Amino acid sequence: MSTYEGRWKTVKVEIEDGIAFVILNRPEKRNAMSPTLNREMIDVLETLEQDPAAGVLVLTGAGEAWTAGMDLKEYFREVDAGPEILQEKIRREASQWQWKLLRMYAKPTIAMVNGWCFGGGFSPLVACDLAICADEATFGLSEINWGIPPGNLVSKAMADTVGHRQSLYYIMTGKTFGGQKAAEMGLVNESVPLAQLREVTIELARNLLEKNPVVLRAAKHGFKRCRELTWEQNEDYLYAKLDQSRLLDTEGGREQGMKQFLDDKSIKPGLQAYKR
């Protein structure tokens, strides 16, 4: 179980069998993201990245919400009343964990969307490698309803995962949609009944824990970078990642996998990971 009890005010961390559950913990505010939460999440992510007990990170929310987005009072009204340099600091901290750290995180990440997911919550949702949501979850880009366009990297997140028409429809109308629609749109990998959400997420996390962590990191980073590069750049970059993973992999995953398949005949790599 967790060794982090009481360390952070707005975030809880529980580690179970290699899975680090990172729980946004402001249920009375539907886990709205405040400047304090943003600062604490930077520390949480950097701490867990170095913790060998945390093999896969699952991001979820306490109570009935994943996150309602940015805390309107703390993030906007109070920050807007301060100097411009304060606004810049607060925005930088928000982007640091919601996108920069999470998107290229060293370990696999899964968004476990248990309820409300609004506005700024779309950035960390898409930054996670994989996402499972509850059928009962409610998603919405409500910024237009209170007079601003989507902030942070919400529009970029939508553009990278959801088609042009669907993105603009929800950005411009502010209408909400449920878990099944989120899965249909490709915003999440799968939508399941809330009662099954944790079980399904744990099953996925255990699948990832079976994989070689060095190679898994190279594979996910390679995919995310390749979307930004030309074909020629990708050829060089992805071969470099392949060579890098072999150098960094102390357990010799490639050699182990080849041996178990070709020599020992003990695995079927099309159906399972090699035995670590």
From Swiss-Prot:
Record: residues binding vanillin: 75, 151, 239
EC number(s) on file: 4.1.2.61
Entry binding sites for acetyl-CoA: 29, 68, 70, 72, 120, 142, 146
Listed GO biological process terms: isoprenoid catabolic process
Activity's dependence on pH: Optimum pH is 8.5-9.5.
MF terms in GO: feruloyl-CoA hydratase/lyase activity
Variant or mutagenesis effect after changing residue 143 to A: Abolishes catalytic activity
Pfam families assigned: ECH_1
Keyword annotations: Lyase
Catalytic activities: (E)-feruloyl-CoA + H2O = vanillin + acetyl-CoA; (E)-caffeoyl-CoA + H2O = 3,4-dihydroxybenzaldehyde + acetyl-CoA; (E)-4-coumaroyl-CoA + H2O = 4-hydroxybenzaldehyde + acetyl-CoA; (E)-feruloyl-CoA + H2O = 3-hydroxy-3-(4-hydroxy-3-methoxyphenyl)propanoyl-CoA
InterPro entries xref list: ClpP/crotonase-like_dom_sf, Enoyl-CoA_hyd/isom_CS, Enoyl-CoA_hydra/iso, Enoyl-CoA_Hydratase/Isomerase
Domain of life where this protein originates: Bacteria
Enzyme class: lyase
Complex and partners: Homohexamer; dimer of trimers.
Function: Catalyzes the hydration of the acyl-CoA thioester of ferulic acid and the subsequent retro-aldol cleavage of the hydrated intermediate to yield vanillin (4-hydroxy-3-methoxy-benzaldehyde). The enzyme is also active with caffeoyl-CoA and 4-coumaroyl-CoA producing 3,4-dihydroxybenzaldehyde and 4-hydroxybenzaldehyde, respectively.
Homology family: Belongs to the enoyl-CoA hydratase/isomerase family.
Protein name stated in the entry: Hydroxycinnamoyl-CoA hydratase-lyase
Organism annotation: Pseudomonas fluorescens
